[in-house]
């Protein structure tokens, strides 16, 4: 997937723009 501009180690991903956590990095679905 396309990496989002954030990590999901300490904060959750921006699911409102379709990002989900994979391997400690937020990816767009």
Swiss-Prot record:
Q: What is this protein called?
A: Cyclotide mra1
Q: Which family does it belong to?
A: Belongs to the cyclotide family. Bracelet subfamily.
- Which key words are in the record? Disulfide bond, Knottin, Plant defense
Which biological process terms from the Gene Ontology are attached to this UniProt entry?
defense response
The cysteines joined by S-S bonds are 4-19, 8-21, 13-26
PROSITE patterns associated with the record:
CYCLOTIDE, CYCLOTIDE_BRACELET
The record ties this protein, via SUPFAM superfamilies, to: Cyclotides
Q: Which organism is it from?
A: Melicytus ramiflorus (Whitey wood)
InterPro entries associated with the record: Cyclotide (IPR005535), Cyclotide_bracelet_CS (IPR012323), Cyclotide_sf (IPR036146)
Keyword Transmembrane tagged: no
Superkingdom per UniProt:
Eukaryota
Modification(s) after translation: This is a cyclic peptide.
